[in-house]
Each structure stands twice: as structure tokens, then as C-alpha cells.
Curated annotation (Swiss-Prot):
CDD domains: PIN_YqxD-like
Coiled-coil intervals: none
Family: Belongs to the UPF0178 family.
PANTHER family associated with the record: UPF0178 PROTEIN YAII
InterPro entries the UniProt entry points to: UPF0178 (IPR003791)
Superkingdom field: Bacteria
Name the UniProt record assigns to this protein: UPF0178 protein Lin1493
Leader peptide range in chain numbering: none
HAMAP family: UPF0178
Length: 146
């Protein structure tokens, strides 16, 4: 049975993920750095890793199996996990596709270069209640069609 792995450090839709997981009786594993440690995990399955730059990513790569569902905003991690045969959602409910990754990684690279040159672009807009509903609807539809 597939599981849901969540890149939890900055994930704004943890509550929505838990609701969908309960609806479809799926296990959820939240992976976060010790910087986000809490004793209040409410019976959830949390794995805390070192605060190193790629520690959470490495742990998620090791935990992920073909058919698992991943939630991350990290395009680099998404591209690696897609190659493992997982399904990867963004925090906004977009289902990443392997054929899009090359372009997305190129855009990420160009934006990083622009930031190095002192050009700053706006970050993503804040999550609204409507965004949260959309995420939950998209994930629910995915599982209903699976």
C-alpha cells in the first residue's frame, strides 16, 4: 500500500494532507529538520533529521518507494522522486510530471542566477483558504481516480 511522504519543514497544507490520508486510509510520514521539532505531534508519524541542507531530502529519497505520494515544493527533490516512480504534488496541489522537470529545473536555475546578480523576483503568494481547498480537492480526486 502506498504511503504519503511530506517535506514538512515549510509545508502549509499538513492538516489537509492528514484529512485526505484518513479518508483513504493511508499512512503519512512527515519529514522535517530538528529545527521544527515539537513534542506535540498528535500521534502523527514524524521523522526528524539533522539540520543539514539536504538531510530531509536524503531521508525522503531513502523512504520513498514506487507508487508512494510525495508532497514537496522542492523541484530538485521532485525530479529525483519522480524518477523513482512516485507521484509528487506541490504544496498547491499541482501534480508534477517527469516531462516538465527539465524546464522547471532550468527556470529555477535562471532565477537563482538572477538573484546572485541582485535581481529579485516576488516569491509565491501566501496560501489562502481557497488554495487549501484546491489542494485537498486535487489530492482527493487523484486518489479517487487511482
Amino acid at each position: 500500500m502506498p504511503k504519503i511522504l511530506v517535506d514538512a519543514d515549510a509545508c502549509p497544507v499538513k492538516a489537509e494532507i492528514k484529512q485526505v490520508a484518513e479518508q483513504f486510509q493511508l499512512d503519512v510520514i512527515f519529514v522535517a529538520s530538528f529545527n521544527h521539532y515539537s513534542v506535540n505531534t498528535n500521534g502523527e508519524n514524524w521523522i526528524f533529521v539533522d539540520t543539514g541542507k539536504e538531510s530531509a531530502d536524503m531521508r525522503m529519497m531513502n523512504l520513498a518507494n514506487k507508487g508512494d505520494i510525495i508532497v514537496t515544493q522542492d523541484i530538485g527533490l521532485a525530479s529525483i522522486l519522480l524518477a523513482k516512480g512516485t507521484y509528487v504534488f506541490s504544496n498547491r496541489g499541482e501534480l508534477y510530471r517527469e516531462e516538465e522537470m527539465s524546464l522547471m529545473l532550468d527556470i529555477r536555475y535562471r532565477h537563482a542566477k538572477e538573484r546572485q546578480q541582485g535581481k529579485y523576483s516576488k516569491g509565491p503568494k501566501a496560501m489562502s483558504d481557497q488554495d487549501r481547498v484546491l489542494f485537498k480537492d486535487r489530492m482527493t480526486t487523484f486518489f479517487k481516480n487511482k
